[in-house]
């Protein structure tokens, strides 16, 4: 029997005990949960309730512990510490206290000074530091134990810039709360150098919440596009003050950089018409997110806001949602690192946590779909890189989503794709508008009534009917106010200030200007206009001239001076041509003594004086004893008779009108006539569109007219159309005004008339302040009225008067070349034909004489030409050789006494 050594026995027993204890520890470990502590440092206000971030921190830890899906074998605990605002020393002390307890990560604090102090400690000891608010990164630190769930400031700045570009703003005012706002909005601040954008930067008062002085200055400067970079609590106060100052109207558009715009109580502003736009990172369209937010609201973990704070009760703020997501993201990293344990760390020893680097890497690699959407981090600097923003805007139903923005795709506006039918009355329905106008017949005038009238019932006219139709279509109500200074609106050359209705629109004292307000270039630069509801132009109003009886020489009027001159020239020309052709044609020569066939003398009746007498006789329809014998001269005579027939008939027909009509002679017929004289004064309404036209015109005639008017400004420029019309009636004055008003006036006053045509072309439109959302609605309604024919019917209603008796033509039109020029062409053609016939007769007779006289054709032609060129009525014929004349030829000569004697054709 072998004996076992006591020493060996003790060794075996000891090892067995250790194995048993190890197995028991493993079994215990598998049957129990691992406990992990998170640290939270939060700022607080003395005597104030617990902050939303701390509540969300506790809510997230409790939710994870209740729902074992994420960390089934780990129980989270937390240690929370409170510090005063901006107390970095206290923040460092609290962080060291938590690290000595042993924490896996520290959440918070929020403000930069405290957060930087805590971050430096976490970096030194290798403990992750989780941030949920924006903090400026001084420099990239690859080894930084820091992540932030707040969207990157450069991305948010680009999102705001995209909104500004989408709204096509040209001027923007940036209002920031503290200096960090300029860093957050640096992309927008750099925009003027790259885009056509004017930027004005203002800062909210630091020591008070009273923003009224700043808002008053912005209102005076007409700054309608404003970006507010402030907290949602400050935004709520600003909106209340803006409402009290009348800055919550449709002309203002505010963009808020806070992601908590949805937490504001916007009920007082829903129907104000103000444009309010912002961003939201909470993914409220996700059912799981909505369920968590609903639990948050039901448990009412967050302390209710103060009664007049302007914030909604029970809403989960963005800071709270980001803290909730931050706890879950860190928990995802814990899930992937089950062997991690925490240890007590001392700030004065600078010994880092051995699991810190690995744990920090897991946090930066973590992905989570949280309340604020996808959560991923830049592994280098720990900033959140991938996120989606909802673009929200204030509507009558409240804040609604109108688009999205993300860093990769940019802005995507989806407001028009909501399936709602387009309705032009949406933005005007049930709104009450201030309408400025001016008394101007027939556009706006006081209604005549035996009973006292009040409000809008005091007025009637074309513009009042137009306003009533627009109100019916668009569904708005209105209050009519007469412009205070009684002017349409013009710009002062010295200080550049506007007056009249234009000024009231610029100052937003009125929403619409419904009046005969002309659309001009200079006005269009400061206010907006609808499409014109009436087109017109500038013309001249002048009194009708007195009638005059026909003058002593009015018998010359039926034909224009040009025609009289052409007739005289035609008479002289035809007479000369007849004389030449008669001399040239052999058949116009005859024997004055037919009984003496041997006579060598021949005669030609068409001497120069006789030719003129022949033309006068035909022209006076009396005839003469002279009768052409040759074909060529008869052609001249016939054409001249035809010419005189047409001329005399036309003259006779037109003479009656000139002798019976009283001519209405006006000293001016056009603007050129006005510009060329100074006897008749002329002017327009002071500070009206007509005056501005002449003032700005570069055309020499109109520039000359403006020089005349400006030199006599006090005497020729009038205050109103009524004053100008009265001056036309009582003095030698021409009034420049719109053609439609002239048409109305001349229908009712038969002593007035329009002189000339239109000097320019323009239109009347409904004026609105610059950028008004009403302009397009008004334009659509005006086009609808135009298509329905209502604009024409309204004009017929107000322009139709008793009418003046129809006037006969002021004067019969003198016949000009365009009326009877053809007869001159016929006359010229006849003269040309007669010349050719005369040449033919000359050649034929020369050839015949050459044969009879037995000589050459050329010598015979020269002899005939020599005789024709002698301006004598009777010539003696000198034959070159004797010729025996037979009896038959003598008899033949006596028979035709208009032919030359045989053998005598050639004259000496």
Curated annotation (Swiss-Prot):
Membrane topology category: Multi-pass membrane protein
Classification via SUPFAM superfamilies: Periplasmic binding protein-like I, Periplasmic binding protein-like II
Pfam family, one: Lig_chan-Glu_bd
Signal peptide annotation: 1-31
Family annotation (InterPro entries): ANF_lig-bd_rcpt (IPR001828), Glu/Gly-bd (IPR019594), Iono_Glu_rcpt_met (IPR001508), Ionotropic_Glu_rcpt (IPR015683), Iontro_rcpt_C (IPR001320), Peripla_BP_I (IPR028082)
Keyword Disulfide bond in annotation: yes
Summary of the tissues where the protein is detected: Expressed in the hippocampal mossy fiber synapses (at protein level). Most abundant in the cerebellum and the hypothalamus. Expressed in a proportion of dorsal root ganglion (DRG) neurons (13.6%); predominantly small diameter DRG neurons (75%) with the remainder expressed in medium diameter DRG neurons.
Glycosylation site list: 67, 73, 275, 378, 412, 423, 430, 546, 751
Residues binding L-glutamate, per UniProt: 516, 518, 523, 689-690, 738
Gene Ontology BP annotations: behavioral fear response; chemical synaptic transmission; detection of cold stimulus involved in thermoception; excitatory postsynaptic potential; inhibitory postsynaptic potential; intracellular calcium ion homeostasis; intracellular protein transport; modulation of excitatory postsynaptic potential
Cross-link entry Glycyl lysine isopeptide (Lys-Gly) (interchain with G-Cter in SUMO1), positions: 886
Superkingdom per UniProt: Eukaryota
Disulfide partners: 96-347, 750-804
Residues recorded with modification Phosphoserine: 846, 868
Cytoplasmic-side segments: 583-638, 841-908
Residues in compartment: Extracellular: 32-561, 660-819
Listed GO MF terms: extracellularly glutamate-gated ion channel activity; glutamate-gated calcium ion channel activity; glutamate-gated receptor activity; identical protein binding; kainate selective glutamate receptor activity; ligand-gated monoatomic ion channel activity involved in regulation of presynaptic membrane potential; PDZ domain binding; scaffold protein binding
Membrane spanning stretches: 562-582, 639-659, 820-840
Post-translational changes noted in the entry: Sumoylation mediates kainate receptor-mediated endocytosis and regulates synaptic transmission. Sumoylation is enhanced by PIAS3 and desumoylated by SENP1.
Record's GO cellular component terms: dendrite cytoplasm; glutamatergic synapse; hippocampal mossy fiber to CA3 synapse; ionotropic glutamate receptor complex; kainate selective glutamate receptor complex; membrane; mossy fiber rosette; neuronal cell body
Cited function: Ionotropic glutamate receptor that functions as a cation-permeable ligand-gated ion channel, gated by L-glutamate and the glutamatergic agonist kainic acid. L-glutamate acts as an excitatory neurotransmitter at many synapses in the central nervous system. Binding of the excitatory neurotransmitter L-glutamate induces a conformation change, leading to the opening of the cation channel, and thereby converts the chemical signal to an electrical impulse. The receptor then desensitizes rapidly and enters a transient inactive state, characterized by the presence of bound agonist.
Assembly notes: Homotetramer and heterotetramer with GRIK5. Tetramers may be formed by the dimerization of dimers. Assembles into a kainate-gated homomeric channel that does not bind AMPA. Can form functional heteromeric receptors with GRIK3. Forms a heteromeric complex with GRIK4 and GRIK5. Interacts with DLG4. Interacts (via C-terminus) with KLHL17 (via kelch repeats); the interaction targets GRIK2 for degradation via ubiquitin-proteasome pathway. Interacts with NETO2.
Family: Belongs to the glutamate-gated ion channel (TC 1.A.10.1) family. GRIK2 subfamily.
Anything else known: The postsynaptic actions of Glu are mediated by a variety of receptors that are named according to their selective agonists. This receptor binds domoate > kainate > quisqualate > 6-cyano-7-nitroquinoxaline-2,3-dione > L-glutamate = 6,7-dinitroquinoxaline-2,3-dione > dihydrokainate.
Protein name: Glutamate receptor ionotropic, kainate 2
Gene it is expressed from: Grik2
């Amino acid at each position: 029997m072998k004996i076992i050594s006591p020493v060996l026995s003790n060794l075996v027993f000891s090892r067995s005990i250790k194995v048993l204890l190890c197995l028991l520890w493993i079994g215990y470990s598998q049957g129990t949960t691992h406990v992990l502590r998170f640290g939270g440092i939060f700022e607080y206000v003395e005597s104030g309730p617990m902050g939303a971030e701390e509540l969300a921190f506790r809510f997230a830890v409790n939710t994870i512990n209740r729902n074992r899906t994420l960390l089934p074998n780990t129980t989270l605990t937390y240690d929370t510490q409170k510090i005063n605002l901006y107390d970095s020393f206290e923040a460092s002390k609290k962080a060291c206290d938590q690290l000595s307890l042993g924490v896996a990560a520290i959440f918070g604090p929020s403000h930069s000074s405290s957060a930087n102090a805590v971050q430096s400690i976490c970096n030194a000891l290798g403990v992750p530091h989780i941030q949920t608010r924006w903090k400026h990164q001084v420099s990239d630190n690859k080894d930084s134990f820091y992540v932030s769930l707040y969207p990157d400031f450069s991305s948010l700045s680009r999102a705001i810039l995209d909104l500004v570009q989408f709204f096509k703003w040209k001027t923007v005012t940036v209002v920031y709360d503290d200096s960090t706002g300029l860093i957050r909005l640096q992309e927008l601040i750099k925009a003027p150098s790259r885009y056509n954008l004017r930027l004005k930067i203002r800062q909210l008062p630091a020591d008070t919440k009273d923003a009224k002085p700043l808002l008053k200055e912005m209102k005076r400067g007409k700054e309608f596009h404003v970006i507010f970079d402030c907290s949602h609590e400050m935004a709520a106060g600003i909106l209340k003050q803006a409402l009290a100052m009348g800055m919550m109207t449709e002309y203002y558009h505010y963009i808020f950089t806070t992601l908590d715009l949805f937490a504001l109580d916007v009920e007082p502003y829903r129907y104000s018409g103000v444009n309010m736009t912002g961003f939201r990172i909470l993914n409220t369209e996700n059912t799981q997110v909505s369920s968590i937010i609903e639990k948050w609201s039901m448990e009412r973990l967050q302390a209710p806001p103060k009664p007049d704070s302007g914030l909604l009760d029970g809403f989960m703020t963005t800071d709270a949602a980001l803290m909730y997501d931050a706890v879950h993201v860190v928990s995802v990293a814990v899930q992937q690192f089950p062997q991690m344990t925490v240890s007590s760390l001392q700030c004065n020893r600078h010994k880092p946590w051995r699991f810190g680097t690995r744990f920090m890497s897991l946090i930066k690699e973590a992905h989570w779909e949280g309340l604020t959407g996808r959560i991923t981090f830049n592994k280098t600097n720990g900033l959140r890189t991938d996120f989606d923003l909802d673009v929200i805007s204030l509507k009558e139903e409240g804040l609604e989503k109108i688009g999205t923005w993300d860093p990769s795709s940019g802005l995507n506006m989806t407001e028009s794709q909501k399936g709602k039918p387009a309705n032009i009355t949406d933005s005007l329905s049930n709104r009450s508008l201030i309408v400025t106008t001016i008394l101007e017949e027939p556009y706006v005038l006081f209604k005549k009534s035996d009973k006292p009238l009040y409000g809008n019932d005091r007025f009637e006219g074309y513009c009042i009917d137009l306003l009533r139709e627009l109100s019916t279509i668009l569904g708005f109500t209105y209050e009519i106010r007469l412009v205070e200074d009684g002017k349409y609106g013009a710009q002062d050359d010295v200080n550049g200030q506007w007056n009249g209705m234009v000024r009231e629109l610029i100052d937003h004292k009125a929403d619409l200007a419904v009046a005969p307000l002309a659309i001009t270039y200079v006005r269009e630069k400061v206010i907006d206009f609808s499409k014109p509801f009436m087109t017109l132009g500038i013309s001249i109003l002048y009194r009708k001239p007195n009638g005059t009886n026909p003058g002593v020489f009015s018998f010359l009027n039926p034909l224009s001076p040009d025609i009289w001159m052409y007739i005289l020239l035609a008479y002289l020309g035809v007479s000369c041509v007849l004389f030449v052709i008669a001399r040239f044609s052999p058949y116009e020569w005859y024997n004055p003594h037919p009984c003496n066939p041997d006579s060598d003398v021949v005669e030609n009746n068409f001497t120069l004086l006789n030719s003129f007498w022949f033309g006068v006789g035909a022209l006076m329809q009396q005839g003469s004893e002279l009768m052409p014998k040759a074909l060529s001269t008869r052609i001249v005579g016939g054409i001249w008779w035809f010419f005189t027939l047409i001329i005399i008939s036309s003259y006779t027909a037109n003479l009656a009108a000139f002798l019976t009509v009283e001519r209405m002679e006006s000293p001016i017929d056009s603007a050129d006539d006005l510009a060329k004289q100074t006897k008749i004064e002329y002017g327009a309404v002071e500070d009206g569109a007509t005056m501005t036209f002449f003032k700005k015109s570069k055309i020499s005639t109109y520039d000359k007219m403006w020089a005349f008017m400006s030199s006599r400004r006090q005497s020729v420029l009038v205050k109103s159309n009524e004053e100008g019309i009265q001056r036309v009636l009582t003095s030698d004055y021409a009034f420049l005004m719109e053609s439609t008003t002239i048409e109305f006036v001349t229908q009712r006053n038969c002593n007035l008339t329009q002189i000339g045509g239109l000097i320019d072309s323009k239109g009347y439109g409904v004026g609105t302040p610059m950028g008004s959302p009403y302009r397009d609605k008004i334009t659509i309604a005006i086009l609808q009225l135009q298509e329905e024919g209502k604009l024409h019917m309204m004009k017929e209603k107000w322009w139709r008067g008793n009418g003046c008796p129809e006037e006969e033509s002021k004067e019969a039109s003198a016949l000009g070349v365009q009326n009877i020029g053809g007869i001159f062409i016929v006359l010229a053609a006849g003269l040309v034909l007669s010349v050719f016939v005369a040449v033919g007769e000359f050649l034929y007779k020369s050839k015949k004489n050459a044969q009879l006289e037995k000589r050459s054709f050329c010598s015979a032609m020269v002899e005939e030409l020599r005789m024709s060129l002698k301006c004598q009525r009777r010539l003696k014929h000198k034959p070159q050789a004797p010729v025996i004349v037979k009896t038959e030829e003598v008899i033949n000569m006596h028979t035709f006494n208009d032919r030359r004697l045989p053998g005598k054709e050639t004259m000496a």
